[in-house]
């Protein structure tokens, strides 16, 4: 569809025929919503948030959902506060899931220990979306008081709980779903993906630097279940970002496998936004944030330009805005 996209005050004002104070002709190219990584640990990129943004925004990523459990395992709540402050005023919107398991295991001596009371105050922050991957599945099943309190308070705040339950039994998965876990990014087989979707969960199809699961999960995508699937990286090393890109790499792989390009883009945009309750983004529609990516075509998805809140922030692989 050829059309004008009108932008005002950082949002999409209309789609149709418009005249503007400034106009940009992108005829023959494709405009997609800004890409969204639904689960990532920024610390795994070995970069501070500012440099991470510099790396991924030129690849079309305009928002991420991050779990800062790596820095929090060492610094405690100071780590969360640092990450919240360090991600202000960037050309990428950084949303947070609060670390659920600090330390990661009872025997871990990384330096910090957070119970429900320590993290509860952060739910008032507008960029905190919920509780990050609940790794303590044994504690959940056993009814550990702190685990259940964290989950109950997350749900009471109207937030999302991410799961982390690889290779668990169906009955254990039932417990996870019944207690409010809404996502899982640890699926490595089509069977695991289908089991979670059948229980109402969203499945995050992961293609990162440490875990590369996408090729194993793409065969399980169907027109009926694609709306419950979204993309994530979990972790992304700088060399992989430079060589393959960020979430656009997931989109590209899906299309090359044979997934409809529109469906692949939707998994990188609207599906992720809806999963985490981001009603202001994820589509090219009036009232949505003007986070947009200009790509050469719907095959190779070479990113030509990226807009964040209506501002052109990256072009031809480089940042236009100083950080």
Identify what each model region corresponds to:
Residues 29-53:
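Di-metal (Zn2+ and/or Mg2+/Mn2+) metal-binding site signature of metallo-dependent hydrolases
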Residues 53-158, 224:
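Divalent-metal coordination cores built from histidine and acidic residues
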């Amino acid at each position: 569809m050829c059309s004008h996209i009108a932008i005002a005050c950082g949002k999409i004002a209309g789609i149709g025929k418009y005249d503007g104070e400034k106009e940009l002709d992108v005829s023959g190219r494709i405009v997609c919503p800004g890409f969204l990584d639904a689960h990532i640990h920024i610390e795994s990129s070995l970069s501070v948030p500012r440099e991470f943004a510099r790396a991924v925004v030129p690849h079309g990523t305009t928002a991420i959902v991050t779990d800062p459990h790596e820095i929090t395992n060492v610094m405690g709540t100071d780590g969360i506060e640092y990450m919240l402050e360090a991600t202000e005023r960037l050309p990428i919107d950084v949303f947070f899931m609060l670390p659920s398991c600090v330390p990661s295991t009872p025997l871990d001596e990384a330096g910090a220990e957070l119970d429900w009371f320590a993290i509860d105050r952060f739910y008032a922050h507008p960029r905190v979306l919920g509780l990050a991957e609940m790794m303590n599945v044994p504690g959940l099943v056993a009814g550990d008081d702190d685990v259940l309190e964290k989950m109950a308070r997350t749900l009471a705040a109207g937030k999302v709980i991410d799961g982390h339950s690889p290779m668990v039994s169906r009955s254990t998965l039932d417990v996870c779903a019944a207690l409010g876990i809404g996502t899982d990014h640890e699926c490595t087989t089509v069977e695991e993906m289908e089991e979670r979707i059948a229980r109402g969960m969203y499945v995050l199809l992961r293609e990162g630097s440490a875990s590369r699961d996408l090729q194993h999960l793409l065969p399980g995508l169907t027109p009926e279940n694609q709306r419950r699937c979204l993309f994530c990286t979990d972790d992304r090393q700088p060399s992989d970002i430079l060589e393959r890109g960020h979430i656009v790499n997931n989109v590209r792989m899906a299309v090359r496998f044979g997934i409809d390009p529109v469906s692949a883009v939707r998994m990188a945009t609207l599906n992720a936004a809806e999963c985490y309750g981001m009603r202001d983004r994820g589509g090219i529609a009036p009232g949505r944030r003007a986070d947009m990516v200009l790509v050469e075509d719907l095959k190779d998805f070479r990113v030509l330009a990226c807009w964040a809140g209506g501002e052109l922030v990256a072009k031809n692989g480089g940042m236009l805005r100083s950080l």
